[in-house]
């Protein structure tokens, strides 16, 4: 899966689960400050990413995720594992 494909899947997750306009979901966008996610949303996002990749995300790894670009990197790491 390419970075562009991952971004498109993430945009879809944000639109369907958090009612966020996909145009706002850019690699530079901050999850908490710009996209207004909270800690519960972050847990929901981690679950959706696990469903998308079929792999479990370690909570300590996901704690460092702050931007959409970080989410893309986390998905790439999961897919490479």
Curated annotation (Swiss-Prot):
Associated pathway: Lipid metabolism; fatty acid biosynthesis
GO MF annotation: an example: acyl carrier activity
Residues that bear O-(pantetheine 4'-phosphoryl)serine: 39
UniProt KW keywords: Cytoplasm, Fatty acid biosynthesis, Fatty acid metabolism, Lipid biosynthesis, Lipid metabolism, Phosphopantetheine, Phosphoprotein, Plasmid
Family classification: Belongs to the acyl carrier protein (ACP) family.
GO biological process: lipid A biosynthetic process
The record's account of how the chain is modified after translation: 4'-phosphopantetheine is transferred from CoA to a specific serine of apo-ACP by AcpS. This modification is essential for activity because fatty acids are bound in thioester linkage to the sulfhydryl of the prosthetic group.
One Pfam family hit: PP-binding
Name of this protein: Acyl carrier protein 2
Top-level taxon: Bacteria
UniProt GO cellular component terms: cytosol; membrane
UniProt domain Carrier: residue ranges: 1-79
Family annotation (Gene3D superfamilies): ACP-like
Main location: cytoplasm
Function as written in the Swiss-Prot or TrEMBL entry: Carrier of the growing fatty acid chain in fatty acid biosynthesis.
Record's subcellular location: Cytoplasm
Upper lineage: Bacteria, Pseudomonadati, Pseudomonadota, Betaproteobacteria, Burkholderiales
InterPro entries given in the database record: ACP, ACP-like_sf, PP-bd_ACP
